[in-house]
């Protein structure tokens, strides 16, 4: 979708991150810091100031990384956050769109709802969807993905 709209794509590869981070604040912070460092090494080569618009698209712990990188580097960016973890809201700002499933074991829906309300962020909640935005019903999941991509495209187009 982003490429179709003329965005240049810079994919960030995190490398190896700690395992079994869910429920372990120390490991989660370690994973975040490592992912942020990997991102910094790759993204610092980009001259963001030459672009009319910067769009970060992220998922899971990557939502915290994208928000923190943009904030730390004073990049005026728009953000698409797919299934943020609870810790992401420590750095997520007021510019973006959020997608969350009510069966996501990484963060309670009420937390996501409250944090999005505080920031006036559009939030799209999918009932019974997990951290991968899947419900276990393939046909339903395809429809869910189609809806998510429609909302994503609408956000990209609303410059």
Task: State what each model feature region is.
Residues 1-50:
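Serine-hydrolase catalytic machinery in alpha/beta-hydrolase-like enzymes
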Residues 36-43, 137-159:
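Catalytic active-site module of serine/aspartate enzymes centered on a nucleophile-bearing elbow/loop
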Residues 98-100, 104, 112:
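Short beta-strand/loop motif that positions the catalytic acidic residue
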Residues 54-67:
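Gly/Ala-rich beta-loop-alpha elbow adjacent to hydrolase catalytic centers
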Residues 14-15, 80-88, 101-103:
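Active-site nucleophile loop of the alpha/beta-hydrolase fold
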Residues 73-86, 94-95:
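A conserved short beta-strand
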Residues 102-107, 131-132:
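Acidic catalytic loop of the alpha/beta-hydrolase fold
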Residues 22, 129-144:
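Catalytic histidine-centered segment of alpha/beta-hydrolase-like enzymes
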């Amino acid at each position: 979708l982003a490429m179709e709209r003329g965005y240049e794509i810079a994919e960030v590869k995190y490398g190896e991150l700690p395992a079994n981070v869910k429920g372990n604040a120390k490991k989660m912070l370690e994973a975040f810091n490592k992912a942020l460092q990997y991102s910094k090494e790759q993204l610092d080569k980009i001259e963001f100031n030459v672009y009319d618009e910067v769009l970060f698209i992220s998922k899971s712990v990557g939502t915290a990384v994208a928000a923190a990188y943009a904030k730390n580097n004073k990049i005026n960016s728009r953000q698409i956050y797919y299934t943020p973890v609870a810790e992401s809201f420590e750095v997520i700002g007021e510019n973006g769109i959020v997608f969350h499933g009510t069966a996501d074991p990484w963060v309670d829906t009420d937390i996501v709802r409250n944090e999005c309300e505080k920031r006036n962020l559009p939030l799209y909640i999918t009932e019974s969807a997990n951290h991968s935005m899947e419900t276990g019903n393939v046909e339903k999941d395809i429809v869910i993905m189609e809806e998510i991509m429609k909302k994503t495209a609408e956000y990209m187009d609303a410059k």
